[in-house]
Amino acid sequence: MHQDTVRGKAFAMPLISPAYPAGPYRFRNREYLIITYRTDPQKLRDLVPEPLQVCEPMVKFEFIRMPDSTGFGDYTEGGQVIPVSFYGRRGSYTHCMFLDDHPPIAGGRELWGFPKKLASPTLRTETDTLVGTLDYGPVRVATGTMGYKHRAADLASVRASLAEPNFLLKIIPHVDGTPRICELVEYHLEDVHLRGAWTGPAALNLWSHALAPVAELPVLEVVSAVHLVADLTLALGKVVHDYLAKA
């Protein structure tokens, strides 16, 4: 294969059959259970990378069901997102995500820098309760529950939240193990069609695990919960800070 052909075909690995296709990445009927809880502020400050700043001692534990996503298929995700500010702009920093599908793990890490690992999350309705779970191997590390559609949520507030910028710490090593890419990436959700959103009573339990350390941000108090369904496009990102650039 000629070098020009390699350069022309190069998008993702393997060259002849990439693990994921080029975008756009459209999601239909994407369902969220988002439980916001208060945690230890010092632990947050220890985990959130500068120049991001912790806004308040809150964490959002998200269980996300994605039955129809372009190129990525049908999968479920769970993890922790932290409200932050970036030079005065409010947004969210994705701390950790766990999912059950290889293409979005590979694509998420390589394109955007999502901190994704393989695990077994679920989101389902059990009679009158919306239930989210996260297992790492055979070990349960998170369970979230919420009363099913008890009250309609403020749609304007939900739309505003979905429109905020999102931030990721993208790290890709060089062949010698040193960091080749270490960047803060910003991305947005686009073309959002909010199908519905609801609130209700909620609970969240986290358990310690050496390789899925979600319990390192302990639940001190559940503050709120929202259940929403939306169609949206996951836009590609842009680099807003390069940790390897010389000052």
UniProtKB/Swiss-Prot annotation:
Native species: Mesorhizobium japonicum (strain LMG 29417 / CECT 9101 / MAFF 303099)
Protein name (database record): Acetoacetate decarboxylase 1
Enzyme class: lyase
One GO MF term: acetoacetate decarboxylase activity
Cystine pairs: none
Similarity remark: Belongs to the ADC family.
Domain of life: Bacteria
Function, in words: Catalyzes the conversion of acetoacetate to acetone and carbon dioxide.
Pfam family name, one: ADC
Catalytic residue list: 116
